[in-house]
């Protein structure tokens, strides 16, 4: 009886591990190019749930207050696409080239993914 229970528990564990969401981004960086500091930059990262369970984005956040990421609130079905909207407000920041990470946390097998925004901010004239 113990063997049967152990075998059943092992099979159920393996099945739960195999059934997971997987997040795959179309691109992992977004280049805003050259822009003036007074112009807020906006963009989006498109991703697909390539797993077989619904994908839930728990958090998406930048490394500083100048970067805002807005993930979808609803779960993403297997095979469906979703979008994380991002904005960068460089007002009052240092001019020049930058590369800012955005950390995405989800229930996917790859539960933490980093995507990046980059650009070259110029001072206003």
Task: Give names to the regions the model predicted.
Residues 13-19:
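Sec/Tat signal peptide C-region and signal peptidase I cleavage site
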Residues 84-92:
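Short, hydrophobic beta-strand segments
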């Amino acid at each position: 009886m113990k063997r049967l229970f152990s075998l059943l528990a092992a099979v159920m564990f393996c099945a739960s591990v195999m059934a997971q969401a997987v997040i795959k981004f179309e691109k992992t960086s977004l280049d805003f190019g050259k822009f003036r500091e007074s112009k807020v930059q906006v963009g989006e990262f498109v991703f697909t749930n390539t797993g077989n369970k619904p994908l839930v984005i728990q958090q998406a956040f930048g490394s500083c207050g100048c970067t805002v990421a807005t993930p979808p609130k609803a779960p993403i079905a297997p095979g469906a696409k979703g979008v994380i909207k991002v904005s960068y407000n460089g007002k009052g920041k240092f001019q020049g080239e930058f590369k800012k990470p955005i950390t995405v946390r989800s229930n996917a097998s790859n539960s933490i993914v980093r995507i990046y925004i980059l650009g070259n901010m110029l001072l206003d004239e």
